[in-house]
């Protein structure tokens, strides 16, 4: 059963080193995860769910309503008002949530989050707020390690040579639990981690599936199987620094009673993710401001080679929703190998 995931879902692309990309909004489907798209790769991150919940519960005191006839906007509002990820899906020492009014709340957040997460890499908030402006903020961080480090290697992904990791010893293969296998282009793997409360999945295939369908797939997997000595495993390193500014929601007026003269001033989420032969880490923060409208199977050897689009899911063992899901579609998030190597 899917339990504790990373509050992030990403449909990845190719990248040589850590790349920050411009936002592209994904088509919103009512009832699905509120994801966005970076160069053809879909990302869901849990911090925005936490920030939206904080604004809704602590400030507005009701589900948020926005003034828009755009069905895509309303689908996003619905999805955020019916969150797939809440604070119950991650332990308290992995997140920080705060809301308040005026410039003092920005200063308080910047100070408090550094105390709780002294190794935070994402930038401090730089917002300037009026005394009546409202801010809701959420931050989460996770880092996991495989039980045994993998070997570094290179591989081809969609025609490009990228840095990768592979299992070359019995101890490395013991990191991998095969949950479902139809063929070399359709299978589900779980990576065994040092952290007993965390889970990380890799799913190859299901290119047209929604995030909701991928989460359901993991929940319904069968009995785990160990890899055989003749089986092969490779997956690319990943590196991501992304920002979503929600341009379709910024400027929309609130319809909630008492907030009709306010609009969304800023709605930003930042995601930093790394995956290599040692483990994986994610940082994710989200901020929403409310401002006045006057302001701005077979015994044959299996080749478990992730050389085509695949999914990655990270969660806590007993949570309902993942905190990280990545659909890797191309090599934009990978570390390209120079032709000289």
Set out the residue ranges of the language-model regions.
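Bacterial N-terminal signal peptides
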Residues: 7-16
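Bacterial N-terminal signal peptides that target proteins for export
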Residues: 1-6
């Amino acid at each position: 059963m899917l339990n504790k995931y990373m509050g992030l879902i990403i449909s990845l692309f190719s990248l040589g080193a850590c790349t920050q990309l411009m936002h592209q909004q994904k088509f919103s489907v009512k009832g699905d995860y509120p994801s966005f798209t970076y160069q053809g790769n879909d990302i869901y991150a849990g911090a925005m769910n936490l920030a939206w919940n904080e604004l809704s519960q602590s400030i507005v005191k009701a589900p948020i309503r926005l003034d828009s006839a755009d069905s895509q906007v309303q689908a996003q509002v619905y999805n955020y008002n019916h969150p797939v990820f809440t604070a119950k899906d991650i332990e308290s020492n992995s997140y920080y949530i705060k809301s308040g009014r005026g410039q003092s709340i920005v200063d308080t957040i910047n100070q408090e989050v550094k105390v709780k997460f002294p190794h935070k890499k994402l930038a401090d908030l730089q917002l300037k707020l009026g005394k009546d402006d409202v801010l809701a903020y959420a931050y989460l961080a996770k880092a996991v390690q495989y039980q045994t480090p993998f070997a570094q290697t290179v591989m081809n992904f969609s025609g490009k040579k990228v840095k990768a990791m592979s299992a070359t010893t019995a101890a490395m293969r013991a990191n991998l639990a095969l949950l479902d296998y139809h063929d070399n282009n359709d299978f589900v793997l779980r990576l065994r981690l040092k952290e007993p409360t965390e889970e990380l999945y890799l799913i190859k295939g299901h290119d047209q599936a929604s995030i909701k369908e991928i989460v359901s797939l993991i929940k319904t997997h069968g009995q785990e199987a160990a890899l055989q000595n003749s089986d092969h495993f490779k997956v690319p390193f990943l590196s991501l620094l992304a920002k979503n500014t929600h341009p379709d929601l910024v400027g929309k007026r609130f319809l909630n009673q008492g907030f009709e003269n306010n609009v969304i001033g800023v709605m930003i989420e930042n995601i930093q993710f790394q995956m290599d032969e040692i483990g994986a880490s994610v940082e994710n923060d989200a901020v929403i401001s409310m401002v006045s409208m006057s302001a701005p199977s077979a015994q044959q050897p299996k080749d478990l080679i992730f050389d085509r689009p695949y999914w990655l899911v990270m969660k806590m063992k007993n949570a309902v929703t993942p905190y990280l899901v990545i659909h890797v579609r191309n090599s934009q998030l990978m570390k390209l190998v120079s032709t000289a190597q």
